[in-house]
UniProtKB/Swiss-Prot annotation:
Residues 515-529 are annotated as: Linker. The keyword Acetylation applies. The gene is Capn2. It is found in: Cytoplasm; Cell membrane. One of its GO terms (biological process) is positive regulation of phosphatidylcholine biosynthetic process. The lineage of its organism: Eukaryota, Metazoa, Chordata, Craniata, Vertebrata. Its main location: cytoplasm. This is Calpain-2 catalytic subunit. Binds 7 Ca(2+) ions. Forms a heterodimer with a small (regulatory) subunit (CAPNS1). Interacts with CPEB3; this leads to cleavage of CPEB3. It comes from Mus musculus (Mouse). It holds the Pfam family EF-hand_8. One of its GO terms (cellular component) is chromatin. Gene3D superfamilies: 2.60.120.380, Cysteine proteinases, EF-hand. InterPro entries: C2_III, Calpain_cysteine_protease, Calpain_domain_III, Calpain_III, Calpain_III_sf, EF-hand-dom_pair, EF_Hand_1_Ca_BS, EF_hand_dom.
Length: 700
């Protein structure tokens, strides 16, 4: 229940703007300004208690407390490492980022790309920090985390060995912004070792809040040139690189002056007429040197003489140092990988860009209720969360004659790096997209069931199920309604996720879920209508006071269930018997009279019938995935979040719900619905309670 309250509070804060870049969430409630001022007033340097200068901050296995790699490590402040430490010298550049003894080259490549754009760098690395003015041993950075911007505070104690920084360091040795940025990122992910292994796109996204896609240029999609042009129009960050096959290859220069293992940026894509035919050209920037392409379409290439002088001047006169043009075919031949980070509208301050439309939806998989696994598990796949996508407007221009609506889908699993310390790692994740059948279009309150997925093929799906933080794909579909189903590969895997959809045109997205509904069959009973046989049974069971208490009810039901072979049960707990009595005890006596007992007896017989019918394997029990169908048979339609709560409350460790817990759940639900209905006679869907009333109902 605490988790639900926290989620509701977070939703309200997000609606008020908390989590935007301007109102970043204070990680672990640490406020940079407050902590720095406290240190300045006390004349002390900040020591971060939440990420201490101890082995636990380094790692858990290879960098664990007893690892040979962590022997002899000392934590030192930059003022202890060199005579004149600087935060940033002459702007952030690639040479500020040299890899240390940690396998986080993916992160460093993303940081290197970040230095190409000063405006975006300043969003992550606030520039007003130094080791001179108002120095208090504290620094702060901002990262995007699953739809929210988070401000992370660190002290400047850094791990060293033999007087040298152990991890990221600058070539000059006196510049520390990159080492402190790495430390802040390690903190938000649990420890330094958690950063080992990853994809550059992960860093791209956490530094920009964008959605990053990448292409192997050996197998480019046929419309890649158009994708690049559109990305540039939208202000996206584009990077390309040439793979290296060994450490010796790093920074090696090819015969046509391209540098291997080097992060280049793509800054232009144009088609020009040359000798009567159209040539596709790509403009590339090498921001860290004068080494430029010497192949066709370089600055001095005769091919430029075949281009209209005005076009040539327009393309070449505005080039910056290190920029050069090359043909698109040469680009595909020489470069290995292209990465595109599509930025969110709030990141782009220039109005000239055509901005993406962005939607983010959060969800979770919970073992036993909404963690259904992939299509290989048809009995549970349908129970995964479902999201409706309404594509209404086609793109303005066609790509290769294909009309439709372009959109990107990114499925991110949350906080998995942070859980590596506990032995967890990335789940294998993916998603499918299904066309909504015509008879269901326009409806958002129907969770598609098992039969739909048994008879319907996915219209699109993620390229693969993979154990990375994010699975991302670009699609183009005709206008219409589609349902997106994210899942882990195997069922029963707990996890939180967010889905982001970037679309060229406005589109609607929302969770698909059953509306809350209770169609409870009312049992009309007058004492005169109750047959004599039941009356005699009641007198025999109730005794002299002609009423049945919860304790007497427990004894009665235990005898009844002991005779049944088709339902496994140890009888009813006293708690279940008490809530059954509470549900029907209208006079407040704490006991059931003849009429009340008759109604309860009728309900229990109905519950038994449902339990047997849902138990298709005749095990005498019900698993948690069958519970959803059983609740529907009993008249309840509930959203996924409530199914998660029910499984957590009423299923055992093996996801079995016995008859006692099944009945307790149904009685609890019926009681809550009745209370709500009595307090909301106008059917507004809302009630108001003071604290005393809330507590009274909560302890039912």
């Amino acid at each position: 229940m605490a988790g639900i309250a926290i989620k509701l509070a977070k939703d309200r804060e997000a609606a008020e703007g908390l989590g935007s870049h301007e109102r970043a969430i204070k990680y672990l409630n640490q406020d940079y300004e407050t902590l720095r001022n406290e240190c300045l007033e006390a004349g002390a340097l900040f020591q971060d208690p939440s990420f201490p200068a101890l082995p636990s901050s380094l790692g858990y296995k290879e960098l664990g407390p007893y690892s040979s790699k962590t022997r002899g490590i000392e934590w030192k402040r930059p003022t202890e490492i060199c005579a004149d430490p600087q935060f940033i010298i002459g702007g952030a550049t690639r040479t500020d980022i040299c890899q240390g003894a940690l396998g986080d080259c993916w992160l460093l490549a993303a940081i290197a790309s970040l230095t190409l754009n000063e405006e975006i760098l300043a969003r992550v690395v606030p520039p007003d920090q130094s080791f001179q003015e108002n120095y208090a041993g504290i620094f702060h950075f901002q990262f995007w985390q699953y739809g929210e911007w988070v401000e992370v505070v660190v002290d400047d104690r850094l791990p060293t060995k033999d007087g040298e920084l152990l991890f990221v360091h600058s070539a000059e040795g006196s510049e520390f912004w990159s080492a402190l940025l790495e430390k802040a990122y390690a903190k938000i992910n649990g420890c330094y070792e958690a950063l080992s292994g990853g994809a550059t796109t992960e860093g791209f996204e956490d530094f920009t809040g964008g959605i990053a896609e990448w292409y192997e240029l050996r197998k480019p999609p046929p419309n890649l040139f158009k994708i690049i042009q559109k990305a540039l129009e939208k202000g996206s960050l584009l990077g390309c690189s040439i793979d290296i096959t060994s450490a010796a290859d790093s920074e090696a220069v090819t015969y046509q002056k391209l540098v291997k293992g080097h992060a280049y940026s793509v800054t232009g894509a144009e088609e020009v007429e040359s000798s009567g035919s159209l040539q596709k050209l790509i403009r590339i920037r090498n921001p860290w040197g004068q080494v430029e392409w010497t192949g066709k379409w370089n600055d001095n290439c005769p091919s430029w003489n075949t281009v209209d002088p005005e076009v040539r001047a327009n393309l070449t006169e505005r080039q910056e140092d290190g920029e050069f043009w090359m043909s698109f075919s040469d680009f595909l031949r020489h470069y290995s990988r292209l990465e595109i980070c599509n930025l969110t509208p709030d990141t782009l301050t220039c109005d000239s860009y055509k901005k993406w439309k962005l939607t983010k939806m959060d969800g979770n998989w919970r073992r036993g209720s909404t963690a259904g696994g992939c299509r290989n598990y048809p009995n549970t796949f349908w129970m995964n969360p479902q999201y409706l996508i309404k594509l209404e407007e086609e793109d303005e221009d066609e790509e290769d004659g294909e009309r439709g609506c372009t959109f990107l889908v990114g499925l991110i699993q949350k906080h998995r790096r942070r859980q590596r310390k506990m032995g967890e790692d990335m789940h294998t994740i993916g998603f499918g997209i299904y066309e909504v059948p015509e008879e269901l279009t326009g409806q958002t309150n129907i969770h598609l069931g098992k039969n739909f997925f048994l008879t319907t093929r996915a219209r699109e799906r993620s390229d693969t199920f993979i154990n990375l933080r994010e699975v991302l794909n670009r699609f183009k579909l005709p206008p219409g309604e589609y349902v997106l189903v994210p899942s882990t590969f195997e069922p029963h895997k707990d996890g939180d996720f967010c889905i982001r959809v970037f679309s060229e045109k406005k589109a609607d997205y929302q969770a698909v879920d059953d509306e809350i509904e209770a169609n409870i069959e009312e049992i009309d009973a007058n004492e005169e209508d109750i047959d004599d046989g039941f009356r005699r049974l009641f007198v025999q069971l109730a005794g002299e006071d002609a009423e049945i208490s919860a304790f007497e009810l427990q004894t009665i039901l235990r005898r009844v269930l002991a005779k049944r072979q088709d339902i496994k049960s140890d009888g009813f707990s006293i708690e279940t018997c008490k809530i059954m009595v509470d549900m029907l005890d209208e006079d407040g006596s704490g006991k059931l009279g003849l009429k009340e007992f008759y109604i309860l007896w009728t309900k229990i017989q109905k519950y038994q019938k449902i339990y047997r019918e849902i138990d298709v394997d005749r095990s005498g029990t019900m698993n948690s995935y069958e519970m959803r169908k059983a609740l529907e048979e009993a008249g309840f339609k509930l959203p996924c979040q409530l199914h998660q709560v029910i499984v957590a409350r009423f299923a055992d460790d093996e996801l079995i719900i016995d008859f006692d817990n099944f009945v307790r759940c149904l009685v609890r639900l019926e009681t809550l619905f009745k209370i709500f209905k009595q307090l909301d006679p106008e059917n507004t869907g809302t009630i108001q309670l003071n604290l005393a009333s809330w507590l009274s109902f909560s302890v039912l």
